[in-house]
Every structure is written in C-alpha cells, then in structure tokens.
C-alpha cells in the first residue's frame, strides 16, 4: 500500500500533472513550431530564390541597356551571370528565355544543347505575355529520384518592355527533408525530455532558465558582432515575449549594421568614381582619404599621400595654413602636376561638429586643364585674327595715304599701289571667308552633303586639273585598278585636295614633283591617300602644329604666297567630318607627305553581276 500512498502523494500528482502538461504542451509547441518553421523555411527559401531572380533581373537589364540586343556578347554576358548561380545547392537550373521564348542561356550543363531553341512552357508564356511573376510546384528527377521543385518565373523589362524571362527551378525538396529531420529530432528530444522529467522532476525549473541562457549566449554573440543567431521561443509567456523582443532587437541591430555598411560602401564607391579629386583629412590636416582621381591628378602613389600633410601634398604649405583655409572658402587655380600640365580648381571645406569642433578638412580638385586650354586658344585665336587683319589694313592704309599725298598722279607708282591694295583686299576677303567657314564647322551649321562616288575617277579628275594648270610640275600617280567607292561630299573633299596639292606645288623647289599614292584596306574598309612633294620640308618639332589655326612654319613666306594659315585647319575639320583622319610626315630639306584616311568600299570585278 506504500506505493499507492506514494502514487497519491502531492509530489507524484505534481509529477504526473507536470508530465501530462509537458506532453500536451510539447504536442502543441511541436505543432506550432513545425508549422512556423515550415512556413519560415519555405518563406526564406522562396525569398532567397526571389532575391537571386531580382539580382539577375537587374544585371540582365543592364546588359541589354549597355549592348545591342541579341548580340553574341550579350548572350555570353547573360550566360556568365547565370553561371555565378550554377553551383548554389538550392538551384536546380536557371534559364534566361527571350521574348520569343528562345532559350538564351542555362546553368545546367546537360541542357546547354537547348540554347537557341524555343521552349513551350505555360508559366514562361504567362510571364512573357502578362509581364508578371508566377510560380508553381512540380515533381522532377535530378538523378536521385523524383523530388519537389519550386519553379519561379520573373519577366525582365527594359524601358517597361518585356524582353525576356528568368526561369528558375529550385530544390525545395531539401527544405522538406530538413523539416523531416527537425521533426525526428523534435520527437526524440520530446521522449528524452519526458524521461528526464519523470525521473528528475526537480530540474523543471530548467525549462524556465533555458530561454534566459539562450538570450545570454546570444548577447555574447552580439557583442562579437554576430547578429544572425536567434533565441529559440519555447512558449508565449513573458519569457517567450522577452525572447521574441530580443530577436526583434537583434534583427533591427543587424539591419542597422547592414545599412551602415551599405552606406559606407556606397559612399566609398561614389568617392572612388567621382570625376573630381577628393582629399579628406583629420583635424590636424593629415590626409586620410584620397580617391583615385585625386591620385591621378597629383601624379602620386597612394602611399605618398595617405598620412601626409594635405597642404604639403598640394605644395601649398608655404602659402596657406589650416586656419586660413578655415576662414577663407574661396576657390583658386593650382598647377598641381607640372609634368602632366594639369591645372585644377581647388575648393576647401571644413568639417565641423554641432559644437563647433573641427574634425577635418576636405579638398575638392576639379580638373580645369581643358577649360584653361580652350581659354588660352581663344585668346590666341583673337590675337591671331587681329594680327592677320591688322597687317593688310596697315599696308592698305599706308598705300592709300601715299595716294592721297599725290602718288596717284605718278603713272608708275599709282598702278602698283592700287595693285597691292587690291591684293591685300583679296587676302582679307579670303581670310574672312575661311573664318566664316571655320565658324560654321564649329557650330555644326556647315552641312556635309555626302554622296557615293567613284573615288578613282574623282581623284584623277582633280589631279588632271592641277596637271593642266601647272606645266612646271611632274605629277606621279599610284592608284589601284579596282574601283573604290567612297561616300563623301565632293565639293568639300575637292577643297581639301586642292588645298593640299596647292601647298605641295607652292613649296616644292627645283624640278617640282608631286606624288599621289592611294592604298586600300579591304579588311577595315578604309583607304589612305598620300600626297608627297619634294619641297623644303617642315622641322620635326613643327609637323604636328601645321593643322592648327593661323599656324605658319615660315610666316613671312606664307603671307608672301597669299596663304591665310587656315587652309589645313579647314581641311582637318572637313576630313574629320567624314570620319577620316589627316596627318603629316616631313623630313626637312627633302619634302613633306600629307596622309588622309577615309571610309570606302572596294568593288571587285563581277560584284555588280549578282
């Protein structure tokens, strides 16, 4: 009867009641946990797959915007993007299908033969036609028997137009396997817990302290920077709510940390890829941040800048102090790289806390080298125009004054003076006409009217005209027999060749000889015209300048021969407007060669027979 008494004891009843409560509670918790875990795992799984799809969507959209649609390069880039996800365990296969339902790329090696073939899939058609995502479950065999697969389709859009579909097969069966394993573990754990509870009832309090222990462990992990772990929730009591709140706190801290890191990376990316140079210092003026553009403009390595005094890096330590920079926010021009000739506009700003404490300085270097060059060229251009107009005007004024003073009555001097005045007037007219033409080209108002012509006939016609006019010059031609067609403005290109040929004849000496060589490159559909003279040549340090406006190698001789200094500059503008190039090679004392490259089409015999 002792055992019956023991059975009826409060201790036993408490143990029995506790065991019954444990059994009921574990069943409820188990069901809730299993359902919640299943939903969480499935949601997380689908969220991950959806995230992969969105990442691919953004990257594929970028590929289509950067490259010609349907090009080989675009297809290869898309394949490379898909390959980045090929080895992910949860991915069965990813395909990219264009708007015509043609498979452009796939991660599955065994299905590479399906590339460029049309696929008939209802979910793909739905995604392409409606422009909306869709998903469904299917059974599929990946070599280890049939398993559940979650298929997800997301349309890819460029400028609101659907250009394709990302088709993803994901191994969701692994999630169910994981749930089964967890259920088995849970069942085993329940049995062990019941066994231990019956024998060691006095350890019941441990069920209360366990969540607290978990939270303590999670706190330790958070202090180490690990925010991914979560406290297991055993119930809905105050401790469970505390665990849930703790998990939410951990999640928010993780999100805040991720946002901070994201903003830091974004800021680093912006600073790195800025077109302006950035130097950021601490409160003592030591450089702590220098982007690539700043290093490039300064012509210095990173180790020669970071940690050094900013004003010393900018060679301003003898001109300014940090206090002066703080008081004066005006920008100024600075020659920061004499070797490269880089001129920058430097703006300084001070980083100040709300309390007024200075924490650092920022220098923004804006490259104005090109602007300064343009301004310098503008001033030179105005000076050259003024000089070119002043010279003939001064000459004309002198002759007119002489005529007013009575020279008009001299039958020998008067005609000579009038002739010089007329020549100077004509030179000014030519100069003004050339300036007007250059102005039209600069403003793109000088229209280029292209037409397809027989270039062989075109160049021979120009040479024949000059050959008939210049009896004292020998013209040598080396022009291919094949017909070369070029799409050019005949009037404009005639002006170019007339200018080059006139210069060649003008500066040739002795037995004047002008050679013409035309070579074609069928591979690139380009031709090169070379016009060579046996003239006085050009010094090697001046060859590249002859296409500059108003540049003359010998100013006195050029004016004497009636040149304005704008002919080759106009020729360069015309050639470049034809997608061509013009340059010169010269040996002083031996002659000069002018090279002109232009697009062309070479017609072989029989090409017109088709």
Swiss-Prot record:
Broad class of the protein's primary localization: membrane
Stretches assigned to the PAS domain: 263-334
Pfam families hit by this protein: Cache_WalK, HAMP, HATPase_c, HisKA, PAS
CDD domains (UniProt xref): HAMP, HATPase, HisKA, PAS
Annotated localization: Cell membrane
Modification type Phosphohistidine: residues: 387
Gene Ontology CC terms: plasma membrane
Primary role: Member of the two-component regulatory system WalK/WalR that regulates genes involved in autolysis and cell wall metabolism. WalK functions as a sensor protein kinase which is autophosphorylated at a histidine residue and transfers its phosphate group to WalR.
Listed name of the protein: Sensor protein kinase WalK
